[in-house]
Amino acid sequence: MKLGMVGLPNVGKSTLFNALTNAGAESANYPFCTIEKNIGIVSVPDERLDKLAQMYDPDKFTPATLEFVDIAGLVKGASKGEGLGNKFLADIREVDAIVHVVRCFEDDNIVHVDGNINPLRDIETINLELIFSDIEMIDRRIDRAKKAAKGDKKFLSEIDFLEKLKTHLEAGKSARGYDFTEDERELIKSTPLLSAKPVIYAANLSESDFAGNIENNENFCKVRQLADEENSAVLPICAQTEAEIAEMDDEDKAMFLAELGLEVSGLNRIIKEGYSLLGLISFLTAGKPEVRAWTIKKGTKAPQAAGKIHTDFEKGFIRAEVIAFNDLMDCGSMAAAKEKGLVRLEGKEYVMNDGDIVLFRFNV
């Protein structure tokens, strides 16, 4: 699963990406320093894995991962190919969700592409480019449906829906805010709309604002209100602080976060929020050879989860031995959990839960 990091030039996007992935993307005080998209794989923080590692002392420790893509800075006119517009839109098309870095800090030494700080305008700039691109796609879809309707009247209802969606988009509203019926959702699946992708707004604050009372930052409050209105997530972060934290060892990091009154870094909150935003959960496998988290979509059944480990596991699935993470921790060992009857046998229709510890039985 991929999350694309977007933002106008000089909002702190690449600084945040560098901290997130330690990938070292060039970060400079001028537009388009990120011309080629940079890709980084990050581990999903999961304290359950750490506790399983203490229990099993495994030879190998493998957390779940997410892919983050630092996408080139965008300016107005992207949907018409201006700046790096065509590349920006093509890169957005490839990701599953968007982390939109929004500048909420004042700094005369860092230029803003529009000359002053206005996060709502910045958000609108990017959202409108995605919306304009979607309108073009909808127009082409309407043209095809109208031609098809000459021979098959069933396309008339599709045209009616597409016209309504186009009107919604032309009002400057993203597809995320459109109230799709189940049938409409099926219809639009073949036309991946950019403005329908889920969003996390990362509100980039100054170090002083981030360390103080965030509520005093009017820019952050405006972004939060907008996020609430469109059912998106918003996280206050300080890219500069995150860059410093990323260079610290675990002990110094814990002390620094405690001084800020935080339990986890902003980066970890972005990663966890991204995991949740994509509708992902983890099931766990544990033993001496390896303790590992496996990523699946919510609602995945046991055989399909087994297939994440190996296709043979899914083809020859017999049953799954399952215990909830908390039950195992309460018992202290798998042997004690089995004695108490807490290890369940589940069949092909079992829907996996987040934190299930599983041993799959199969035969091929």
Region locations from a protein language model:
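Amphipathic alpha-helical transducer elements in NTP-driven molecular machines
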Residues: 32, 46-49, 62-68, 82-96, ...
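Short capping/connector residues at structural and topological boundaries
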Residues: 6, 32, 37-40, 47-49, ...
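C-terminal-of-GTPase-core extension/linker across diverse P-loop GTPases
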Residues: 2-6, 17, 144-351, 358, ...
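Conserved Switch II/interswitch segment of TRAFAC-class P-loop GTPases
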Residues: 40-45, 72-82, 93-155, 168-181, ...
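Conserved G1/Walker A P-loop phosphate-binding module
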Residues: 1-111, 139-140, 144
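Phosphate-binding glycine-rich loops and adjacent basic patches that engage nucleotide phosphates
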Residues: 12-17, 45-57, 85-109, 121-130, ...
